[in-house]
Amino acid sequence: MSATQADIAEIEKLEDRREAAMLAADIDTLDELLHDELVYSHSTGGMDTKEVYIGSLRDKITVYKRVARDDQTVRVHGDIGLVFNHVQIEAEYKGNDLKLDNRLLAVWKRDDGVWRLLAIQSGAIPPQIR
């Protein structure tokens, strides 16, 4: 397995860990996986830092109920990993049920041999083209 193939496999496993941590509201795992400079750009237009995103899960402002990913492609360019996928999410946000159907770009950055999630850009798929 080449370095790039090994990196792709590692990033895919990290995405699985991140999804499991989101569903379990596993703050310790998310703290480990997320870069301190994380920018999370939601499909709703909101933007979170690592601190705000983790706080939302810790305080149960956001509760993930289901996350389903498919159509995933991972590209690695040096110490940057790009994950492109389709994600369907069922969550509760501030007591309101949400069903999201989004395209997602996740940017992973390797620092000192450790991959951490640096950025997410989520875009809603318009209902008329689903």
Residue ranges with predicted function:
Residues 1-33, 37-130:
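A beta-strand edge to alpha-helix "cap/lid" segment located at domain peripheries
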